[in-house]
């Protein structure tokens, strides 16, 4: 299945049609009116209709749309970031209210230009959402924030319902896939998050198809469990443009199912694995029982 050709043909199970109905169009208009960005749109996520219209979940990207890193799998723009917008937390919170979301994921570009890595705005966004939407559950998906403990503590003190930080790939491929991050620093970030707030579930994600072996995927699972990570998502890497890393292999859905079973056998409380699975997929199901009780009132 793997080849060295520049263009590996996409298998049939990855060919889907995006559903862009009136509901989708209305929500997209709302995002633009509030000068907000969603990963759902920017990444052209295939699950956007299911998440927005059916599951009432969405992923907002804060701290601007320009990243200070240039990871070789990611299509987000890189360069000189914009100034901090301290009104952004309230705009996100109001959009969550208008969209009547049951679960919201807040992620951000990496802001290595900021001493706190954007932690203060992240934390204020969590608090603003909770003030206006007390029953909506909140997941945060930050960068490693430079690996600075105080930055992570600022974020965890806001008490999100899930702390998600993605290792993205296996140990061997990390220097090539995300050169300005390290595998060990990401593991330490996840471990410290659990130490700060033991009752808050921690989560990470791996994309496969970059040349890793099955043994390396399993090793990554073991590394995550050794650092007390509760939830895992596994999805197929898709090359955003010709400038990005090539796809080495398209995994069959049966292979994803096998990986899911292995992950659950290792003690992960929840695992989503499939060709179109992304970090936020079915995120509303992954909160703890107390948070699920809140969702029922949303």
Swiss-Prot record:
Cofactor mode of binding and number, as noted: Binds 2 [4Fe-4S] clusters per subunit. One cluster is coordinated with 3 cysteines and an exchangeable S-adenosyl-L-methionine.
Q: Where do the annotations place [4Fe-4S] cluster 2 binding?
A: 67, 71, 74
Q: Which SUPFAM superfamilies match?
A: Radical SAM enzymes
Per UniProt, subcellular location reads as: Cytoplasm
According to the UniProt entry, its GO molecular function terms are:
4 iron, 4 sulfur cluster binding; lipoate synthase activity; metal ion binding
Which residue range or ranges hold the Radical SAM core domain?
Answer: 53-269
Q: Which HAMAP family match?
A: Lipoyl_synth (MF_00206)
Name the UniProt record assigns to this protein: Lipoyl synthase
Organism equals: Geobacillus thermodenitrificans (strain NG80-2)
């Amino acid at each position: 299945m793997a080849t060295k050709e520049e263009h590996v043909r996409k298998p049939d199970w990855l060919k889907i049609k995006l559903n862009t109905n009136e509901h989708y169009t209305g929500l997209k208009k709302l995002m633009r009116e509030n000068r907000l960005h969603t990963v759902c749109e920017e990444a052209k996520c295939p699950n956007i209709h299911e998440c927005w219209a059916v599951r009432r979940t969405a992923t907002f990207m804060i701290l601007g749309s320009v990243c200070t890193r240039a990871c070789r799998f990611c299509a987000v723009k890189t360069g000189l970031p914009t100034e901090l917008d301290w009104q952004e937390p309230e705009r996100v919170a109001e959009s969550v209210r208008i969209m009547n979301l049951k679960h919201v994921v807040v992620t951000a570009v990496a802001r290595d230009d900021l001493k706190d890595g954007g932690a203060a705005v992240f934390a204020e966004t969590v608090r603003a959402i909770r003030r206006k939407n007390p029953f909506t559950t909140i997941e945060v998906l930050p960068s490693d924030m430079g690996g600075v403990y105080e930055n992570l503590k600022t974020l965890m003190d806001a008490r999100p319902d899930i702390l998600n930080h993605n290792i993205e790939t296996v140990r061997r491929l990390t220097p090539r896939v995300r050169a300005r991050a390290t595998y060990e620093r990401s593991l330490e970030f996840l471990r410290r998050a659990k130490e700060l707030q033991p009752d808050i579930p921690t989560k990470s994600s791996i994309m496969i198809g970059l040349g890793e072996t099955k043994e390396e995927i399993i090793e990554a699972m073991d590394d995550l469990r050794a650092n007390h990570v509760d939830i895992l998502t596994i999805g197929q890497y898709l090359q955003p443009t010709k400038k990005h890393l090539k796809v080495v292999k398209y995994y069959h859905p049966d292979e994803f199912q096998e990986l899911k079973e292995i992950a659950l056998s290792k003690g992960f409380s929840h695992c989503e694995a499939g060709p179109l699975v992304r970090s936020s997929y079915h995120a509303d199901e992954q909160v703890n029982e107390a948070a699920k009780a809140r969702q029922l009132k949303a």
